[in-house]
From Swiss-Prot:
Originating gene: drd1c
GO MF terms, alphabetically ordered: G protein-coupled receptor activity
Cellular localization per UniProt: Cell membrane; Cell projection, Cilium membrane
Record GO biological process: adenylate cyclase-activating adrenergic receptor signaling pathway; positive regulation of MAPK cascade
Protein name in the entry: D(1C) dopamine receptor
């Protein structure tokens, strides 16, 4: 009877171990599937960006797109040189690649840093294009862009391969703890405090402060221009009819909606970046101090963060590389290139009015961004500046085209482009975007009102990025 009881206990323990093993196997299979989907989406998105620029010359002609390409290359490196090795480790439960560990750690630091620094460069490029568009047009050449990109990649290499190959990054306490343990099965980077803080400052904290500052300034500039345009619209409405109270209310509501749209887009750009990377870099600076032994303490303190929690936040940071193509390279030009590459021209919608997206545009634009009013004819139409042809604007308009001349001399445009049936059209920007922010020049607003229309041969519009 006693032997039978022992047999039952043994069988029950065996079944329990089998259930645990099946559960662990299912969890690893699910983890492998999710990580594989993340890697494939990162590869697909960033490969499409690179192919689009290689295939379409007009995308290579814009200096701004050089920064987007550099970002896509760094994210591709994350998907090729970093993610797969860690995914295999997560599924297997241990590091299976032996002495490749140090090289992998260096690739991880280099690619992640390059991706973040490229995001910082894009924010600076946008700010300069918006704050000083005419100077940006002159100064931001291909040579300057390549220098900025080169600095970002050089800095990424300097803080990754040199310290890792010289073992400056390792924690001596972690090395002592690993004595007697097979190092080839554990690829724990265990950074020392000095390297953890200095690398985190360069890789994340300084860039994120710069990005917050630049995008805050971009929002304030956009807000100012929205309100100026709103005041012009109210002036036009007041010139047409005496009852201006209703028009003022509508104009204020429109202005508020535009400001909200700009703020929402910028919040998503910064929110996604901070959400993905901030938890990892907080832990990255905190963990080296958690392993510090107090004086007189015989046993080391337990780690303040579990390995599972840390790995989850590592993958959160890498997931940012899969989102960057959607945020920074999904504007009208790139979308058309993507549909051509994927061969879905026949099935994809080609509506001229773009929906709100979170690409290079601050707020997605309409292909016709001209605010047009019909007013009874009270003066000569020839005093109007030439109106931009819609097809011309479609060709010129995508992300951050800096400053473009949108119209030429009166003799180069036919009168039919004015579309003036029984009234006069006035050209005044109604949409604040990173494409066209304002009809204002350095000397003041362009004359959108009938009483102020001047006979000028050239009409400049400031374009954002």
């Amino acid at each position: 009877m006693e032997n039978f009881s022992i047999f039952n206990v043994t069988v029950n323990v065996w079944h329990a171990d089998l259930d645990v093993g099946n559960s662990d196997l299912s969890l690893r299979a699910l983890t492998g599937l999710l990580l594989s989907l993340l890697i494939l989406s990162t590869l697909l998105g960033n490969t499409l960006v690179c192919l689009a620029v290689i295939k379409f010359r007009h995308l290579r002609s814009k200096v701004t797109n050089f920064f987007v390409i550099s970002l896509a290359v760094s994210d591709l490196f994350v998907a090729l040189l970093v993610m797969p090795w860690k995914a295999v480790t997560e599924v297997a439960g241990f590091w299976v690649f032996g002495d490749f560990c140090d090289t992998w750690v260096a690739f991880d630091i280099m690619c992640s840093t390059a991706s973040i620094l490229n995001l910082c460069i894009i924010s600076l490029d946008r700010y300069w294009a918006i704050a000083s568009p005419f100077r940006y047009e002159r100064k931001m050449t291909q040579r300057v862009a390549f220098i900025m990109i080169g600095v970002a990649w050089t800095l990424s290499i300097l803080i990754s391969f040199i310290p890792v190959q010289l073992s400056w990054h390792k924690s001596h306490e972690a090395d002592e703890e690993l004595n007697g343990v097979n190092h080839t099965e554990n690829c724990d980077s265990s950074l020392n405090r000095t390297y953890a803080i200095s690398s985190s400052l360069i890789s994340f904290y300084i860039p994120v402060v710069i990005m917050i500052g630049t995008y805050t300034r971009i929002y304030r500039i956009a807000q100012t221009q929205i309100r100026r345009i709103s005041s012009l619209e109210r002036a036009v409405e007041h010139a047409q009819r005496c009852s201006s109270r209703l028009s003022n209310e509508n104009s204020l509501k429109t202005s508020f909606r535009k400001e909200t749209k700009v703020l929402k887009t910028l919040s998503i750009i910064m929110g996604v970046f901070v959400f993905c990377w901030l938890p990892f870099f907080v832990l990255n600076c905190m963990i080296p101090f958690c392993h510090m032994n107090l004086p007189g303490q015989n046993e080391p303190e337990p780690p303040c963060v579990s390995e599972t929690t840390f790995n989850i936040f590592v993958w959160f940071g890498w997931a940012n590389s899969s989102l960057n193509p959607v945020i920074y390279a999904f504007n009208a030009d790139f979308r058309k290139a993507f549909t051509t590459i994927l061969g879905c021209n026949r099935f994809c919608s080609s509506n001229n009015v773009e929906a709100v997206n979170f690409s290079n545009e601050l707020v997605s634009y309409h292909h016709d961004t001209t605010f047009q009013k019909d007013i009874p004819v009270t003066f000569n139409n020839s005093h109007l500046p030439n109106v931009v042809d819609q097809d011309q604007e479609v060709l010129e308009g995508t992300c951050f085209d800096k400053v473009s001349v949108l119209s030429t001399s009166h003799g180069t445009r036919s009168q039919k482009n004015l579309h003036l049936p029984a009234g006069v059209q006035f050209e005044c920007e109604a949409e604040i975007t990173l494409e066209t922010i304002t009809p204002f020049t350095s000397t003041g607003p362009l004359e959108c009102l009938p009483q102020l229309v001047a006979d000028e041969d050239r009409h400049y519009t400031t374009k954002l990025y």
